[in-house]
């Protein structure tokens, strides 16, 4: 098919494609299209496939021309996109929109224009020489002591509290709860039984952890809370404290160390391991902190626009995930969906821009992964997870998982290269606990 094509770059990562199909090709297309119609046509008084062309065109001519135009546009776009440059290739999630409805006349050239989204065109002008401010954090003896206490708690003996006991911080509470309406009746579908959480450590459902403190075993209380995915609905929650357990901590000694792992013979062995693990966790968190800061700077220093279909597609994926988590129909709660999209948009756009820049830098820096680096990664994963190297290799034997592994290695190598071109400045002092908690929420 003979096509005349003109690609024009527009704002917001869009392209306009103008197409002209030669009259001869349009005629041949229309003739084949009509012949297929005639083979399938059924009209009263005529056998299938025996309807005269003049009768068919008189009765359905307008509809046939519309269908023929749609089929011709689809075929022309397929050929046009196949011949388009890399910068003019449409995004898979983008559906081209007609600039205006075309008129199909088999005796004339057929022309139409569509607008569609493309991968953002980004000119990376500034990718190095940045100053990164990093908090001053270190592992203290207090941090080590706190982690040893957590180990004691994980190895504690759990026992029931007495019948007259009250809920205290550190207790393990078991509760039943349900929502009630204005008349005090149970709201159907809100009943939950046997919910367990640690007071003072976990908030629990409806953030009931603080409310339960001081309640007696078997006591029932009604609390005013906030419900809904956006916490914008008032709710009355009736709670019954069904059980209370307490932890009896073991002594911090060699015996505890040996209970934790056969690798430890003394408390000193355990303490050294704790200190090393905290140091490694801090190192990883600091690296991640610098990586995120670097990506934010790269987005700021290299501005560009995202195609709307890319942003909406990402938000739709997040919405589907939220709906599955809450067990809600995807067709419901349109108002909540709009509110979530408004809240998510800045974060989604930032995330997508970072991904675009990373993909471009991977190509620009020609980052590759060698077979030796893959083997080293297998060893690292096996050591970190306590698995055998053979099991790790088996897990990544599939093409998809192996590709994901290689992409992870490539991105780490790129990050190391980019961070090496930056200057790190020491920021304000911060405790290890606060820093790690902030990074876990980032």
Curated annotation (Swiss-Prot):
Signal peptide: none annotated. Transmembrane segments: none annotated. Residues 170-250 form the PPIase FKBP-type domain. It is an enzyme of class 5 (isomerase). One of its GO terms (biological process) is protein unfolding. It catalyses: [protein]-peptidylproline (omega=180) = [protein]-peptidylproline (omega=0). Coiled coil: none annotated. One of its GO terms (molecular function) is peptidyl-prolyl cis-trans isomerase activity. It comes from the Bacteria. Its EC number is 5.2.1.8. It is found in: Cytoplasm. One of its GO terms (cellular component) is cytoplasm. Its main location: cytoplasm. The keyword Cell membrane does not apply. Keywords: Cell cycle, Cell division, Chaperone, Cytoplasm, Isomerase, Rotamase. Involved in protein export. Acts as a chaperone by maintaining the newly synthesized protein in an open conformation. Functions as a peptidyl-prolyl cis-trans isomerase. Belongs to the FKBP-type PPIase family. Tig subfamily. Consists of 3 domains; the N-terminus binds the ribosome, the middle domain has PPIase activity, while the C-terminus has intrinsic chaperone activity on its own. NCBIfam families: tig (TIGR00115). This is Trigger factor.
């Amino acid at each position: 098919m003979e096509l005349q094509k003109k690609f024009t770059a527009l704002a917001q990562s869009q392209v306009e494609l103008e197409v002209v199909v030669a009259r001869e090709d349009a005629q041949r297309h229309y003739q084949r299209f009509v012949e297929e119609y005639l083979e399938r046509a059924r009209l009263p008084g005529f056998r299938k496939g025996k309807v005269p062309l003049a009768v068919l065109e008189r009765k359905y001519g307008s509809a046939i021309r519309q269908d023929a135009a749609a089929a011709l546009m689809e075929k022309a776009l397929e050929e046009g996109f196949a011949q388009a440059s890399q910068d003019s290739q449409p995004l898979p999630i983008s559906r081209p929109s007609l600039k205006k409805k075309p008129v199909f006349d088999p005796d004339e050239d057929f022309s139409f224009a569509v607008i569609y989204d493309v991968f953002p065109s980004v000119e990376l002008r500034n990718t190095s020489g940045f100053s990164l401010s990093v908090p001053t954090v270190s592992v203290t003896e207090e941090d080590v002591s706190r982690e040893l206490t957590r180990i004691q708690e994980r190895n504690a003996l759990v026992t029931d509290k007495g019948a007259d006991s009250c809920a205290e911080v550190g207790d393990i509470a078991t509760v039943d709860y349900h929502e009630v309406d204005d008349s005090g009746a149970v709201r159907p579908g809100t009943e939950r039984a046997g919910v367990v959480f640690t007071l003072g450590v976990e908030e629990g459902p409806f953030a009931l952890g603080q409310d339960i403190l001081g309640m007696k075993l078997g006591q029932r209380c009604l609390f005013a809370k906030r419900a809904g995915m956006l916490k914008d609905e008032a709710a009355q929650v009736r709670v019954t404290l069904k059980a209370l357990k307490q932890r009896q901590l073991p002594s911090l000694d060699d015996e505890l160390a040996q209970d934790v792992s056969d690798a430890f013979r003394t408390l000193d062995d355990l303490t050294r391991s704790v200190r090393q693990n905290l140091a490694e966790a801090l190192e990883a968190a600091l690296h991640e902190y610098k990586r995120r800061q670097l990506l934010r700077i790269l987005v700021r220093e290299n501005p560009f626009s995202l195609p709307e279909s890319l942003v909406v597609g990402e938000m739709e994926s997040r919405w589907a995930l939220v709906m599955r988590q809450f067990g809600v129909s995807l067709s419901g709660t349109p108002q909540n969906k709009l509110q979530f999209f408004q809240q998510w948009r800045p974060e989604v756009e930032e995330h997508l821009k970072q991904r675009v820049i990373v993909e471009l830098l991977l190509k620009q820096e020609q980052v590759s992964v060698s077979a030796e680096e893959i083997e080293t990664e297998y060893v690292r994963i096996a050591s970190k997870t306590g698995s055998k190297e053979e099991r790790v290799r088996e897990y990544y034997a599939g093409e998809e998982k192996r590709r994901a592994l290689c992409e992870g290695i490539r991105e780490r190598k790129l990050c190391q290269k980019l961070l090496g071109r930056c200057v790190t400045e020491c920021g304000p002092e911060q405790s290890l606990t606060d820093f790690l908690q902030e990074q876990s929420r980032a």
